[in-house]
């Protein structure tokens, strides 16, 4: 319990220090997340479409500031971002909460299968992607899509018997790569 408490204190200090290091950037992201979450609440089932995320965000931000319940800091850091800086919110905004939950279930399920079968490298890749996606926008780049699909597929295929040749699994990866590209 002492180690857990010490770890929590160190983590809290580290997060606070990182926040102070780039305060305006952090405040801007918090505003973006706040406004994006409000936009998701307006259309949670189907989202607004991938191409209209920036427009939906702009409309939600306009409504937020029109209500007048904002701080001076929020007014100072407001802008017109192309991305929400949080892929979970971005996916929910684009395609709705059900698609987000389905994607999380698929990635989480493949992580569990991979972990159970000793695919720790792939599980680490999925975990790092998940952490990175919390404060950035990796799904905007095809290389990250491909990496995510390959890690999910690698974990999922870890349950296949070893009698299936490696070339067949490689062929599936190549097909997935072609579909993404």
Cite the ranges covered by each PLM segment.
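Interfacial juxtamembrane loops and adjacent helix segments
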Residues: 50-93
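Transmembrane alpha-helices of multi-pass inner-membrane enzymes
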Residues: 1, 7, 118-172
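Alpha-helical membrane-protein architecture signal
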Residues: 33, 46, 81-88, 127
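Membrane-interface helix-loop junctions at the exits of transmembrane helices
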Residues: 46, 55-68, 131-142
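Structural signature of transmembrane alpha-helix termini at the membrane-water interface
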Residues: 15-19, 105-115, 131-138, 154
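A membrane-periplasm/extracellular boundary helix in multi-pass inner-membrane enzymes
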Residues: 1-42, 50, 59, 166-181
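Hydrophobic transmembrane alpha-helices and their immediate junctions
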Residues: 95-121
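Transmembrane helix irregularities
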Residues: 92-96, 134-135
């Amino acid at each position: 319990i002492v180690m857990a408490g010490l770890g929590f204190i160190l983590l809290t200090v580290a997060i606070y220090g990182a926040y102070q290091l780039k305060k305006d950037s952090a405040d801007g992201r918090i505003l973006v997340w706040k406004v994006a979450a409000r936009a998701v609440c307006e259309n949670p089932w189907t989202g607004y479409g991938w191409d209209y995320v920036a427009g939906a965000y702009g409309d939600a931000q306009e409504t937020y500031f029109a209500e007048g319940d904002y701080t001076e800091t929020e007014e100072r850091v407001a802008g017109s971002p192309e991305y929400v800086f949080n892929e979970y919110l971005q996916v929910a905004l684009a395609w709705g909460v059900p698609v987000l939950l389905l994607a999380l279930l698929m990635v989480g399920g493949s992580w569990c299968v991979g972990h159970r079968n000793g695919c720790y490298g792939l599980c680490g890749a999925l975990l790092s992607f998940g952490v990175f996606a919390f404060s950035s926008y990796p799904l905007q780049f095809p290389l990250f899509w491909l990496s995510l699909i390959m890690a999910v597929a690698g974990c999922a295929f870890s349950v296949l018997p070893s009698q299936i040749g490696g070339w067949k699994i490689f062929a599936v990866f190549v097909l997935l790569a072609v579909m993404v590209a």
